[in-house]
Amino acid sequence: MSVNGELRYLLIPGGGGSGPDHWHHRWAGSLPHCSWVEQDDPEGGSRAEWVATINNAVTASSTPAVLIAHSLACIAVAHWATAHDGPVAAALLVAPADVDDDWAEPDSLYKRFQPVPMDPLPFSSIVVASTNDPFLAVERARSFATAWGAKLEIAGDHLHLGSDALLDTWPEGRIYLRELVGRARSFNQHLDSL
């Protein structure tokens, strides 16, 4: 898969969706070739439905995709990667919700995504974590990044890196995204030289 040309960006909200004050919305208006991957029921549905929605978006085009996932969507992306493949160049995985932890209620949407897949992702990725996220301890973020073969970025005290964090356009996140795209392109050039 060539990632030297055009890319498309898929914004994948977590449980409950990304409200109007979420950085996802700010990015939607400024990223080229950007589209939403929204669940029919962002507060419900099954893991299989979430994964199928991601698969439909990824395979809708042969243009390589950069997945930009938040919270539960990060875990859905990891589940997608264990069962499917498609033209994914990279993934920015922001505040993956640790669905294996005790905060998730037994009958909640989050528990439907257990266990968190701990297999390497077949594309370049960055996990972004906050130091005071109630849904993801830094040590667990480190475990996810290691298992997934991702780089870990600690973004400071920004809660769950969602609307409540008041990140607006989240310029630091755009830096991570630029780095991720650059890494994906460099890796592709390395493969082309082999």
Regions found by a protein language model. Name each.
Residues S2-T63:
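Active-site catalytic motif of lipid deacylating hydrolases and related acyltransferases
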Residues L10-G14, H70, A129:
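The conserved beta1-alpha1 loop
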Residues G14, Q39-P42, L92-D101:
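Active-site nucleophile loop of the alpha/beta-hydrolase fold
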Residues G19-P20, P134-R140:
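Conserved alpha/beta-hydrolase "acid-adjacent" motif
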Residues L67-A78:
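Gly/Ala-rich beta-loop-alpha elbow adjacent to hydrolase catalytic centers
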Residues H79-A90, V99:
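Conserved hydrolase catalytic core segment
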Residues L121-P122, I126-A129, D133:
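Short beta-strand/loop motif that positions the catalytic acidic residue
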Residues A150-L194:
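C-terminal catalytic histidine-bearing segment of alpha/beta-hydrolase fold enzymes
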